[in-house]
Amino acid sequence: MKFRTAVLTISDSSSRGERPDLSGPAITQMLTPLSDIVWTGILPDDREQIAACLRRLADENQADLILTTGGTGLSPRDVTPEATLLIAEKMVPGIAEAMRAESMRITSRGMLSRGVAVVRGRSLIVNLPGSPKAVHECLSVILPALSHGIETLCGIARECAAQG
């Protein structure tokens, strides 16, 4: 199943045009063989704007998978996880745990990531880190399971037992 993906970059400087967005395009490049990229955008680190965008993308059934990049660290302006939790219906902690475990294998700073993964309606929303390198590392570890999760959300896959 080729799923529909929305990519939202969270960055004050990129939203003002002061710095190019490198992580959003990195996500798009990795997912293009597996997914139709149906929407991309850049927003500043603003909790309400992020939550409103995620809510709209999920509620209007625009994307099966919504990936954010940026705003998951400890900076006072990093609010992506909080915005995501504002609109969450279900938590999917294993995705964020897997990403942190992979990041910590590479650097102890991986434990400082606060990204979350949630479900709203029939959309799976995942917060990725802000650097292209970390995006690649995290997506590489979660991509094998994402298709099954999305198929389950969409009502295609019903069996969640281990398949190998």
Functional labels for PLM-detected ranges:
Residues 1-164:
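Non-catalytic beta/alpha edge segments that cap or flank active sites
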